[in-house]
From Swiss-Prot:
Gene3D superfamilies recorded: L-arginine/glycine Amidinotransferase, Chain A
Gene Ontology cellular-component annotations: cytosol
Organism: Methanocaldococcus jannaschii (strain ATCC 43067 / DSM 2661 / JAL-1 / JCM 10045 / NBRC 100440) (Methanococcus jannaschii)
UniProt entry keywords in alphabetical sequence: Initiation factor, Protein biosynthesis
Cysteine pairings via disulfide bonds: none
Family note: Belongs to the eIF-6 family.
InterPro entries in the cross-refs: eIF6
Gene that this sequence comes from: eif6
Official protein name in the record: Translation initiation factor 6
Coiled-coil region: none
Protein function: Binds to the 50S ribosomal subunit and prevents its association with the 30S ribosomal subunit to form the 70S initiation complex.
Entry's Gene Ontology BP terms: assembly of large subunit precursor of preribosome; cytosolic ribosome assembly; maturation of 5.8S rRNA; maturation of LSU-rRNA
PANTHER family (UniProt xref): TRANSLATION INITIATION FACTOR 6
SMART domains xref list: eIF6
Length: 228
């Protein structure tokens, strides 16, 4: 049974900048209390790790992952890297952990991926091969609604994709084909925020959306991600 819940992370509705999830794992900020961690784990049916990245709680903005790989920025600290690798090993997950040496460290804002494809910002074009090798999927370079922050302006799972509301229909078709998803749609979260990737973490089993998200927005999110 799929689940979707509204949630604040310590009062913050932009939970997508603070966390990332795949089908198997969820990375969450250290400041989150255990009850919230357990609730997220239950909704997404994932193993959760609380960590900083580069000393920052902006885990979702700074990293990106799918079932094959985890991409981290060059500012990741050794202790954090060891913590993440140990967590993966303890859970018998053999992911390609790759540090992307770009000066653009907000990888989660600049990469959109599921287990079937990835869209990366033109700002990361020099790292396309590294990203492709780690995530083990077809990688395309592009924008969403003409914005280079593709990870901030959409959210994708193995079932569906929700994009910035100004995406054109032909762009929707391109994204649907790239990510090989059954469902796709345009919408907002957190009372009209167009950067939906900053407001939502989701996989094929469930979604956690920012606490300011309205009922009508929630219906569109559920539909686009195939969670109904």
């Amino acid at each position: 049974m799929t689940m979707i819940i509204r949630k604040y992370f310590s009062g913050i509705p932009t939970i997508g900048v603070l966390a990332l999830t795949t089908e198997e794992i969820t990375l969450l900020p250290i400041f989150l209390d255990k009850d919230d961690v357990n609730e997220v784990s239950e909704v997404l049916e994932t193993k959760c790790l609380q960590t900083n990245i580069g000393g920052s709680s902006l885990v979702g903005s700074l990293s990106v992952a799918n079932k094959y790989g985890l991409l981290l920025p060059k500012i990741v600290e050794d202790e954090e890297l060891d913590r993440i690798k140990n967590f993966l090993k303890e859970n018998n997950l053999d992911l390609n952990v790759e540090i992307i040496k770009s000066k653009n460290t907000a990888l989660g804002n600049l990469i959109l991926t599921n287990d079937k494809g990835a869209l990366i910002s033109p700002e990361l074009k020099d790292f396309k091969k590294d990203i492709e090798d780690s995530l083990n999927v077809e990688v395309e370079i592009g924008t969403i609604a003409e914005l280079p922050t593709v990870g901030s302006n959409a959210v994708v799972t193995n079932k569906g994709c929700l994009t910035h509301p100004l995406v054109e229909d032909d762009e929707l078709e391109f994204l649907k084909s790239l990510f090989k998803v059954e469902y796709i749609g345009k919408g907002t979260a957190n009372k009209g925020t167009t950067s939906v990737g900053a407001c939502i973490i989701a996989n094929s089993k469930g979604a956690v959306v920012g606490g300011d998200t309205t009922g009508p927005e929630l219906l569109i999110i559920e539909d686009a991600l195939g969670l109904i």
